[in-house]
Design a protein with these regions (language model features):
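Low-complexity, Ser/Thr/Pro/Gly-rich disordered linker/stalk regions
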Residues: 1-171
């Protein structure tokens, strides 16, 4: 879809004080309207990275239990022959709750998926997320996630697809 001011825009950050800015993403609940995102350039090899974002779920957000969860942030690796369809890591919302979703392993064979519920969404309140990932298809992988300064995920082990043919840090 074409980038338009209705889909993505820099705006004054609600409730964060004068001069504070935010990027507003809008995705209409309509057929063929499912994504609005920023992506980073891919990097060869698996890397250790830190990411941070503040997220505001508006007061008027509608949770639709008939739909899948809404992914708020995701990290995808470059797909290879197995064409993985699930992100290696996603922070999502559904049924009024936050979730961390992970997928790794062999996308053409034994894929491992986990879902962790992180508690209720507070509409109209900013949530600060910090993600520390040492991306790896083996036991050297690390995933730590903080929500508003509290560590909510602390895992070691595989966290990327290890057999896609090319190693890329998820973006």
């Amino acid at each position: 879809a074409k980038v338009t001011p209705e889909r993505i825009a820099v705006v004054d950050a609600p409730g964060l004080g004068a001069g504070r800015k935010a990027v507003r993403f809008v995705v209409e609940r309509a057929p063929n309207s499912f994504r609005s995102e920023i992506s980073l350039p891919h990097e060869a090899g698996f890397r250790e990275r830190w990411y941070a974002a503040r997220v505001l779920v508006p007061e008027d957000w509608v949770f639709d239990p008939a739909r899948a969860r809404d992914i708020v942030m995701q990290w995808h690796a470059i797909p290879g022959n197995g064409r993985p369809t699930n992100p290696n890591l996603a922070i999502s919302i559904g049924n009024e709750h936050w979730y961390v979703e992970q997928a790794h392993g062999d996308p053409a064979g034994k894929k491992v998926r986990t879902n962790t519920e992180l508690g209720p969404v507070k509409r109209g309140a900013w949530v600060s997320w910090v993600v520390h990932a040492k991306w790896s298809p083996d036991e050297s992988g690390v995933l730590q996630i903080w929500r508003d300064g509290d560590r909510v995920v602390d895992r070691t082990g595989p966290n990327v697809y290890g057999t896609i043919g090319v190693e890329y840090t998820p973006y």
